[in-house]
Structure formats: C-alpha cells, structure tokens
C-alpha cells in the first residue's frame, strides 16, 4: 500500500510542479490587453516562468543605456534544455563555424519583440506566447528551440507605457484626437538616444544592438521574426516580402516564407482577420531585423500589426472600427505560434537548406582590399570583429586588378603591405559581400529604405573589389609605442579620422593645451600636414604632469606621438608661428524639442556623449536667448523647422553673437531657416524636373518617388586648406538622405561641394 501511495505521489509531482506555473493574466492580476505591462513586470513574469518550468531557461545578455535588463528565454523540451549548449554547437556545424557532423534534428526559431518601443503590443504577446508554447504545444518543442527576446528596446517601451498611463482617460478614449493618441517630442519608438534600433542591426552603433548581435551570432537561427506595428488603418502584414530582394537571397528562403504565409493565412482566415503580403516591406537594406538574419542564412521576416504609438488601449480607425490592444496581442500571438509550428514541421528542409546557404561559394568578388590611416581602419575592424567577419592583411606591396571604388571603374591599383583584406571565402562571406559591394543590384527602384551603404565609402577608405588571387598574412605589423618626451619640446601627431577627434577631445578634457598647424611643415625629420596636432611643453608649463597624461591618453586611443626636438622648422612655420593655432575648449549647445528633428538630435546627442565623449549643453529651442548665447562658443541646430530668424530681436541677437566669434552649425532642413535670409547668402537650389500632368494615376506614385533621394552616396570635393576641411582627402563620399541642395556661396567659403557629375 505504501508503494502504491509513493507511486501515486511520484506521478502527481509533475502535475503539482506544473500547476505552479501561472498564465500572464493570473500572475499580473489583469487580463492582457486591458493594461500595458511595464518592463520590470515582464522581466518578473519571465523569471516566474523559468522558475516554474523545466522547459525554459533565461539568458541575461546586457543592459540598456538606462540600465534596464536585456534577456533571452530559451524554450524547448526538458531534454533539449538539458543539452542546450550541445544543440547550439551541433547547429553551428551547419554553417562551418564549428567543425564536425551537423545536427539536423532541431529547428532554431528566434522571435524578437518590441524593437520599436511604442509598437507595444508585441511584448504583451511575448508573455502570452511563451506560456502557450510550454502549456499547449510541447510537441513542437520536441524538435525546436525557440529563442524569445521579449523586449529589444525596453527604454523606449517604458517611455511610451509610462507616458500613456499618465495621459490616458478613464475609461480610455478611442477618439484619435484624444491626447492619449498623440505622443510627445521624444516618442517611445526609439531608444534612449532616439535611435531606431531596427536600422541598427548591421551598424551596431547602440549598446542594445552590440549586445544582441553577440548573442545572435552565437546561434544563427534558421528563422528570425521581427515583430512590429504600423498605422492604425493597416491590415496585418506578414511575409513573403516585397521586391526588391537582394540577389544573394536564395529561392528556398523565399519559398519558406510562402509556406509560413499559408499557415498564417489558415489561422487568420478562420478568425476573419485581414492581412496582406508581398507589398511594401522589401528585403534589401542590410540593417533591419529581417534582412540582417536573412544575409546570415535565416528566414528573416517582419510581421506588422496595426497600432503603433497612436493606438493605446483602443482607437477608432478611419473605417470606424475600434482597434484594441487585445486584438493586437491576439494577432502577434497567432503568427508567433504559427511560425514555430511551421518550423517544427519542416525542420529537415530548414537544416538542409541552411547548410546549402553556407556551403555555396559563389561570390561576386573574392576579396575586398582597403587601406587608410590607422584611425580610419580601427573602427571598421571593430565592426568586423563584432559580426565575426574574418579579415587578413596584404603580404607585401601588390598591384591588384579589380573595381576601384574611388575611380569607380575596373583598373589595376597599387596597395601597400599591411592593407586590410576581407576574403569572401569564409562563413560570413555573403554578409561581407552585402556590406562591401560597391553597387547593389536592384530589381525595383521603389524601396522601403536607402539603397547605398557600401562600407569603404562610409569609412572613407581607399578600396578595391577584386577577383584576383591575393597574397595575405594573418597579422599586421605592431604599432610603435609613444617614446618618452626626454629633452624634446613636445609631440606631433596626425589628424585625419574621427578616432583622432576622440583623442583630441580627451586631451582637451584633461586640460592639455593643443595646437594645430594651418600650413604644412617639416620638423624633426618628419613632414607634417595641415591640421596635424602638436602638444608642446611651452603651452603646458602650468601642468607639470601633462606629458605623462598625454602619453596615457595616447596609449588608450592607440595613437602614435612623434617627438618634436626643436621649435625651428626645416621647412614651413616654426612652432611659435601664428600658423600654429591654439585649440580652445569650446562651450557647445544643441537645440532640442519643439520643431527640432528628434532623430537628428539623438544622433548629435549620442555623438557627443558616447562617441566623442565631450560635454555639451542641451537647450530647449524655445529658450534660446542672449543669455544662453553669451555662455557658449558653438550653437548646433539639428534638422528641423526653425523660426528664430523671424523675430527681429532674436535674429539680431544671433548675428551679434556670430560677429563676436560664435560658430553656428545647421544640419539638414535647419538650413532652410537661413535660405534667402540676409546676410547669410544661402540660396536653395530648385529642382528643375517637371512631372507630366497627363501621367496615368497608377504611374504617379512611382514617378513622384523617383524624385526622392532617400539614401544615395555622393562624391564631394573638399578644400583641404580650409580649417574645416583639414584632414580630409580631396574627395569625400557622403550619404545624402534628401534631395535638398543649395547653390555655391558667392560670399563665403565653400569647404565642400558636390561635383557637377554627382
């Protein structure tokens, strides 16, 4: 009898243990969709699930800029969870990153929720999805590992959720004009620095992206879904994607999207939910949550639910239908489960074609060769390291035949020993091709985003794409250490990259006086260019530790310093010449809020705080006055619509400040405030193209879009003798995001301008 009782208890134990698991509704104390859930509550629920189930393990992978936790949840059968690392390594054998016989028994599905913070239904859906998987669909988990990132952008999401809770009506007001449907200047869509994390997968400029990319490349899933929201009037979108499709995408990747779509449609049709496919959302620009995984062999997709920051708990759309948060959660939850189901049912096809993707050695070019200063090469190498793209170095000076990026034609170009070489016969070779190719083939000129991103242009490097055999070496020559100052009167160093700018900023913050040369000179056996920096003993007599501090900063920034033995130049100006100008520590202000572009402001904010690491003042646009101007040397106007020149008193205050030496920097559309205004002499260039008034209606959208410049690389000619142009090469390649252009200044300095052929 005791044995029977013991057996009864053993059989009941899993039931009692499983019974401890609560649904999101039960755990949170409200029905999902009737409230928004803050990030710390989401974290707590996922911890509850992991503590209550042997089918889930959590993997914290970092923090946001504001200190919120980023974490993954691995969901599978108990047996798979126990050997999760074994499964990961076996899966990577499909790619060649790990040697050995591949594991083709498991499908790996990665679900990424809430990259845009105010597209907030998807994190709610993530909680419902993980609960459904482990309580209703254990059969799928027998051969599938599901990786769930419940919230990629918790800073933005909490910004939205907190704002909505503070501004909603009770009960909520579904009228679109209500305050709860109109966010403030810094919306919840973006992260702390107002960056769009869905456009940061490849560039990884933000800490959230950097941490996530490391985890993603440890798994390289078969399927990746990026959950989004769109306008309140749109039906649900799921793949297949629209054209253009990058030529590297395989037929199977598109075929599997069709399989998924048919399974999604089965559920949506049953519920009477509208959807659309093959429109609007293409697969081209490589920094999205669908394209980046696609170029790494996955079935990468975007799912788009109606909603975004306008929707709140409920909103009436233009058809008079109320769109509720409950509806939005249901749709994302359905496609999430349908995705896992389809992957589980087709795990063999996924594994077979995943292996084929990485085994395919066809490439447009065999290697990319790049050369430039150490300061320009270093940030590119950091990006390649993050994405685990292998690079080598040229072994000896070589004449290489291929496509020259600067000449924009096929020719033979000399590259010196140590030039950077990225071979494409590697596991990440297809991704390397996408990021480095000089021109991207387009199936359709109408695309969702920019069509130009080639990294050699972005990093300002001389480059060639070649099919020639390249002799390479694994290591580059080590850089020389900074010599002690000894009896020398200071150091000189180059200045031709943003890395050099960071070095200069660190020196200035450490109260080390620095000069730059306005003219070329020869001193201490070395030729110095315009813009080169000089750290001299005579400028730092009141700072006895300046030499030690300067060397420490140079070592930290991997910056070579060359000793200046005498102030007397062999050629050009001496160290005491007026041509060597002292660099003053500037007081900088950047305008924010109002009609300022939040995106452009965020770029500038991130630039100063996270890249340059130099202080600046954030000033509200409507609070700019003479008192503010008197305290600053530099005023930065991000893109936006400004009226500061409309009021005569404000215009005069600005002009007086500029006459006293104030420097004004205007970005993008901020230039419109000065166009046609005296005494600035700035004139906007009018577009000379005309639209045919008799054009058929169906062709009008395509014709109007052909006038737009949403992302193209242009060659600019730079005056390197001007202080602003010092350190640049004569040709500079820039990404233009609009068609706005201005006439050459007749009274002023044209430091850089687009050539006539641009």
Predicted segments, located by residue:
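Bacterial Sec-dependent N-terminal signal peptides
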Residues: 1-23
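Short acidic, glycine-rich surface-loop motifs adjacent to enzyme active sites
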Residues: 190-197, 227, 637-640
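Intrinsic-disorder/low-complexity accessory segments
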Residues: 20-120, 124-135, 139-145, 199, ...
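Carboxylate/His-rich catalytic cores and anion/metal-binding grooves
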Residues: 130, 143-167, 171-172
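Short, solvent-exposed turn/loop segments enriched in Gly/Ser/Thr/Pro and often Arg
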Residues: 149-153, 164, 227-234, 670-671
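Aromatic- and acidic-residue-enriched carbohydrate-binding clefts of CAZyme catalytic domains
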Residues: 175-195
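Proline-aspartate-enriched helix->loop->beta-strand connector
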Residues: 216-230
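Active-site cavity-forming subdomains of large catalytic enzyme subunits
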Residues: 162-181, 202, 206-209, 218-221, ...
